[in-house]
């Protein structure tokens, strides 16, 4: 998984995002000159005009993203849609996972034209753009996973079995808590991952 993740992190190096007017590039909003970081990165944008449609220009025909987010000075733009057809290469993934607000989901695929058009829903003056890396899931069926939180010791939230989706959803999780995901089949410290979760982003410790 390490070599694959390194490949996914480098996949987006050289990507550019441009604002579109009448289907044509009007101005460059953001350029990602380096490989993506493991943690989400949000960059400031100096847009001259408001845009409804923006275009992600890829360095190759491959895309691998956990999340792509757009912001105004008032906050994150919701209901963002990918409108370019893509061919998935990850299991059970759809393009909407790039803009669903959940850093734990993601999408890996091929885009023959090396461009992805994105609909923000209406015109916005974009002030920031964020990217979250795509990482290979380690949640394989039929492994069971237990979510715990720290409160003067590790307390169990819930135990769930992984399925074909590649991610798990837990409910009634304490906000702002230090969390741990434990693979109940594995032994030793490698079976445990400590993290925090805030505003859709998983931050591994």
How should each PLM-predicted stretch be described?
Residues 51-55, 178:
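Short, conserved beta-strand segments of beta-strand-rich sandwich/propeller modules, principally
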Residues 1-50, 60-128, 134-141, 171, ...:
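Disordered, acidic Ser/Thr/Pro-rich linker "stalks" and the adjacent N-terminal cap
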Residues 175-182:
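C-terminal beta-strand-rich structural cap/linker in extracellular carbohydrate-active enzymes
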Residues 133-134, 163:
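Extended charged/polar low-complexity repeat regions
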Residues 149-150:
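C-terminal end-helix/capping segment
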Residues 33-36, 158-162:
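Short beta-strand segments within Ig-like beta-sandwich modules, predominantly Fibronectin type-III
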């Amino acid at each position: 998984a390490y070599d694959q993740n390194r490949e996914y992190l480098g996949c987006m190096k050289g990507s550019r995002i441009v604002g579109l007017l009448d289907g044509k590039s009007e101005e460059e909003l953001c350029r990602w000159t380096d490989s993506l970081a493991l943690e989400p990165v949000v960059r400031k944008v100096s847009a001259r005009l408001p845009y409804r449609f923006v275009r992600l220009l890829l360095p190759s025909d491959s895309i691998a993203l956990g999340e792509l987010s757009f912001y105004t000075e008032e906050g994150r733009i919701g209901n963002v849609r990918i409108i370019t057809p893509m061919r998935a290469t990850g299991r059970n993934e759809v393009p909407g996972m790039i803009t669903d607000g959940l850093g734990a989901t993601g999408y890996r695929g091929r885009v023959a034209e090396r461009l992805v058009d994105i609909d923000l829903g209406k015109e916005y003056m974009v002030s920031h753009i964020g990217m979250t890396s795509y990482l290979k899931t380690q949640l394989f069926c039929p492994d069971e996973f237990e979510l715990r939180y720290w409160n003067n010791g590790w307390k169990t939230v819930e135990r769930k079995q992984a399925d074909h989706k590649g991610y798990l959803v837990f409910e009634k999780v304490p906000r702002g808590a230090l969390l741990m995901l434990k693979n109940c089949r594995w032994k030793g410290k490698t079976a445990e991952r400590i993290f925090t979760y805030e505003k859709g982003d998983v931050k591994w410790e």
